[in-house]
């Protein structure tokens, strides 16, 4: 992605997940007050990097003059001015992260949080706060909250009055405390009240097991809940163990995975792919860059990938790469549809700013933003609990097992096909 060292993030979650590039401190402007310097630093980062060169069809320089002339008497007024300036872009992923929020975003990729376990997003079409995905085993998942459910209020506060980070902060809190959410489920007209008890949310991203339930066949199951800093290492370790245990094929579960570190997603794709393109990125100049697999895949055994409406961002990059390269069969429901990349810049006072800098396309140049990825085999999943994942009630998982043991899942396209499956091209 360039000559400078960059750390790839993916947007959360606050949990808002997408693809983020960490770039560190940037020089402040001179000959201004400290508050003006911070505002100008934020303005300049957007001016230099923002994907839309029209800045939502407005004069970005005039906005600079407007906000730098505003009296900025303290840091809170400066943050408010920056947030108002960014809001004129009418794009929810470009946003200010105050120091605590910036720190929390970093923590979510490596540690644990006390909250209800929801990744959230502001729908750019409705401007409504909605659920991207509940974390596996979280209070939110146990309560049955689903992707695209709208969050109308948090403890009685209308979410239309809250920023994304303010909403996230209200849902976090000490363990065993309660928070009330007013939820409008997709396809319904009457909101429901949910009272959830906050718990420590483990961010360990991988669960794996060998499934011997089908006679004569062993299927390795890997569930990846997010692309955190240790995701690649844990997936690689799980894959190595399952290979040693004699797995004949694999199910990679990306359901309700809202994304994570972009580099982790690319590295995990390389575990499965032969030499091939993983993803293209396109910046505001139209310059296209690509990430590729090096041809050193860890296995060439048949692979099925489970996806649903909560599969977003970096998860869609991985799923799209495996589908477009005919390496895997996708099973489940259409994915979320987030195809934008944000760079995360650290500001001079310890705050941060996320700026949408690029969009991505799958290896076959599909732009999935707001469209999602359609699986090869559409299987709708009735509501199940976390404990029922991989059980007979998990019809998507059972469909994946059927594909693997019935002989229609995709194996490494350049290798001999194991007896467990025959290769086919996705429809």
Swiss-Prot record:
Catalysed reaction(s) here are:
The enzyme shows specific recognition of a C-terminal tripeptide, Xaa-Yaa-Zaa, in which Xaa is preferably Ala or Leu, Yaa is preferably Ala or Tyr, and Zaa is preferably Ala, but then cleaves at a variable distance from the C-terminus. A typical cleavage is -Ala-Ala-|-Arg-Ala-Ala-Lys-Glu-Asn-Tyr-Ala-Leu-Ala-Ala
Where is the signal peptide, in residue numbers? 1-31
* One term under GO cellular component: plasma membrane-derived thylakoid lumen
User: Which gene name belongs to this protein?
Assistant: ctpA
Q: What does this protein do?
A: Cleavage of the 16 C-terminal residues from the D1 precursor of photosystem II (PSII). This proteolytic processing is necessary to allow the light-driven assembly of the oxygen-evolving cluster (a tetranuclear manganese), which is responsible for photosynthetic water oxidation.
Instruction: Return the Pfam families for the record.
Output: PDZ, Peptidase_S41
The superkingdom of the source organism is: Bacteria
Domain PDZ: from-to ranges:
104-186
EC class name: hydrolase
Originating organism:
Synechocystis sp. (strain ATCC 27184 / PCC 6803 / Kazusa)
Q: What is this protein called?
A: Carboxyl-terminal-processing protease
Name the Enzyme Commission number(s) assigned to this protein. Answer: 3.4.21.102
Q: Which residues form a coiled coil?
A: none
Subcellular location(s): the record lists:
Cellular thylakoid lumen
User: In Gene Ontology terms, what is one molecular function of this protein?
Assistant: endopeptidase activity
Keywords attached to this entry: Hydrolase, Protease, Serine protease, Signal, Thylakoid
- GO biological process annotation, one example: proteolysis
UniProt family annotation: Belongs to the peptidase S41A family.
């Amino acid at each position: 992605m360039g000559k400078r060292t960059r750390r790839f993030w993916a947007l959360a979650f606050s949990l808002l997940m997408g693809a983020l590039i960490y770039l560190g401190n940037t020089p402040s402007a001179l000959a201004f007050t400290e508050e003006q310097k911070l505002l100008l630093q934020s303005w300049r980062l957007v001016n230099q990097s923002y994907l839309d060169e029209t800045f939502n069809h407005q004069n970005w320089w005039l906005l600079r003059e407007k906000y730098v002339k505003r009296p900025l008497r303290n840091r809170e007024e400066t943050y408010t001015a920056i947030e108002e300036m960014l809001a004129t872009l009418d794009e929810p992923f470009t946003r200010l992260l105050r120091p605590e929020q910036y720190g929390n975003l970093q923590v979510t990729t490596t540690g644990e949080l006390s909250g209800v376990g929801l990744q959230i997003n502001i729908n750019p079409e409705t401007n409504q706060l909605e659920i991207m995905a509940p974390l596996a085993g979280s209070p939110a998942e146990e309560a049955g909250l689903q992707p695209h459910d709208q969050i109308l209020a948090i403890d009685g506060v209308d979410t239309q009055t809250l920023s994304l980070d303010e909403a996230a902060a209200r849902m976090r809190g000490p363990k065993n405390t309660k928070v009330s959410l007013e939820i409008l489920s997709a396809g319904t007209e009457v909101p429901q009240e949910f009272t959830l008890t906050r718990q420590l949310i483990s961010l360990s991203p991988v669960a794996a097991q060998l499934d011997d339930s089908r006679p004569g066949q062993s299927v390795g199951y890997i569930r990846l809940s997010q692309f955190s800093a240790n995701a690649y290492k844990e997936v690689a370790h799980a894959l190595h163990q399952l290979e040693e245990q004699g797995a004949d094929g694999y199910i990679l579960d990306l359901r309700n995975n809202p994304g994570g570190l972009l580099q982790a997603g690319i590295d995990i794709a390389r575990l499965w792919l032969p030499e091939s393109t993983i993803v293209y990125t396109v910046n505001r100049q139209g310059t296209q860059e690509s990430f590729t697999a090096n041809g050193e895949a860890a296995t060439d055994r048949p692979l099925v990938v489970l996806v649903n409406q909560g599969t977003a961002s970096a998860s869609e990059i991985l799923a799209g790469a495996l589908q477009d390269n005919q390496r895997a069969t996708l099973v489940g429901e259409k994915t979320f549809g987030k195809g934008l990349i944000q760079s995360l810049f650290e500001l001079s006072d310890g705050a941060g700013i996320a700026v949408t800098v690029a969009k991505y396309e799958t290896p076959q140049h599909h732009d999935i933003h707001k469209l999602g990825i359609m699986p090869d085999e559409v299987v709708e999943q009735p509501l199940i609990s976390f404990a029922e994942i991989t059980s007979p009630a998990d019809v998507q998982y059972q469909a994946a097992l059927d594909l693997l043991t019935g002989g229609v899942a995709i194996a490494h396209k350049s290798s001999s096909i194991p007896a467990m499956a025959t290769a086919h091209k996705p429809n």
